[in-house]
Curated annotation (Swiss-Prot):
One of its GO terms (biological process) is translation. Belongs to the eukaryotic ribosomal protein eS19 family. The keyword Ribosomal protein applies. Pfam families: Ribosomal_S19e. One of its GO terms (cellular component) is cytosolic small ribosomal subunit. One of its GO terms (molecular function) is structural constituent of ribosome. This is Small ribosomal subunit protein eS19G. Coiled coil: none annotated.
Amino acid sequence: MVKATSVKDVDQHEIVQHIAKFLKKSGKVKVPEWSDVTKMGISKELAPLNSDWYYVRTASIARRLYVRSPTGVDALRLVYGGSKRRGVVPNHFAKASGSVIRKALQTLEAIKWVQKHPDGNGRVLTKQGRKDLDRIASQMRQNDRFTA
């Protein structure tokens, strides 16, 4: 008997990598032109080193909406924020870039995985998005079962 697998049943780091691969391979997600020169937030000094960072961030946001929904841009800025280095003065928390998160959410809306919440309280995952994420998780679980 095959047990149903959801995104919550698999390792979060692995599922994000698999979702990112799926988004890149599907060709539906278009990386913005400015992605090679942008920082991920005010707390970062350099642009991301991973060339597929946009797919990974979009996949991470999709997983986050699966687990905790509805979620808005400001809440996601807190999740992806970090410590800002200020030299000899103690560090402070700084939010992540709202533009990057907003564009990633708009990308997920374009492929019909995410929609705006009817009450205006952020965004929620659609049935199609939930179904696709569960399918990716079950394929991941099956591949792990065959390789182990």
